[in-house]
Amino acid sequence: MATATPPPQDFPPYPPFTSLRLAAARDVAQMANLSVQGFKDSEIFRYERPGHDQYPEDAVAYFANLYRDRLEDPRAVVIVAEDWDGAERVVVGVGCWILPQDSPRTGQFVVPCVGDREPALDRDLCCRRLELFNAVTKATEERYLDGKVICDKFVVHPSYQRRGHGTAMLRWSLRLCTQDTVDQGVIPSHVGEPVYLSLGFEVIGEMHVPDEGDTQGFTQRVAVYKARQT
């Protein structure tokens, strides 16, 4: 006896896009490249990837695989911003959010057939620092961001910053949170923090990344957008 195909799940509508769209599998390479360009001067990137100048291609492979994972993740939402590069439209910004475990949108934004993972040599990485950072981040999220939408990745290519792409992506995510009455949390970089605060996020705590050998650690603040109060 043939097995009946289950009916498609009825998801709630999401806010409409104007200049943005949901990410697709064809965007992975552009998302990876712009993420390296946008993140490489951040305190996190420098801490984790001391060998980047020697092996720049390794970070690109890492981000390509990360975005493939996110596109297939039932709890992830990935959107992109586009702009002109000559006569061609290119991806210039990426926003990625992780939904709470009980979200009715789980599975809504899954992208199939994202392609094979690339060999990730990670020669630029300091594995010890990566372990430290991941452990501290996990503990911080469990303490401050449990049950919230978490802003996982948020970046605009340096050549296209100050054109409103970052603000547009973040505003869309806030409309989604407001519609679902779910708060959003983030542990932003020092450079990115003002963008969040300008749109209504409030600082509620700190995350301390420890020194590792001769490498100095750093502190980032934790911020939350309280959608339930809007």
Swiss-Prot record:
Q: Which InterPro entries match?
A: Acyl_CoA_acyltransferase, Trichothecene_AcTrans
Q: List the disulfide bonds.
A: none
Please verify whether the record's keywords include Lipid biosynthesis.
Answer: no
Spell out the molecular function terms from Gene Ontology. Answer: acyltransferase activity
Give the UniProt keywords, A-Z: Acyltransferase, Transferase
- Name the top EC class: transferase
Outline the extent of the N-acetyltransferase domain. 143-230
The pathway noted for it is: Mycotoxin biosynthesis
Q: State which Enzyme Commission number(s) the record gives.
A: 2.3.1.-
SUPFAM superfamilies of this UniProt entry?
Acyl-CoA N-acyltransferases (Nat) (SSF55729)
Q: Which domain of life is it from?
A: Eukaryota
Q: What does this protein do?
A: Acetyltransferase; part of the satratoxin SC3 cluster involved in the biosynthesis of satratoxins, trichothecene mycotoxins that are associated with human food poisonings. Satratoxins are suggested to be made by products of multiple gene clusters (SC1, SC2 and SC3) that encode 21 proteins in all, including polyketide synthases, acetyltransferases, and other enzymes expected to modify the trichothecene skeleton. SC1 encodes 10 proteins, SAT1 to SAT10.
Additional detail: Trichothecenes are sesquiterpenoid toxins that act by inhibiting protein biosynthesis.
The entry's protein name is Acetyltransferase
What species is this protein from? Stachybotrys chartarum (strain CBS 109288 / IBT 7711)
- Phylogenetic placement of the source organism: Eukaryota, Fungi, Dikarya, Ascomycota, Pezizomycotina
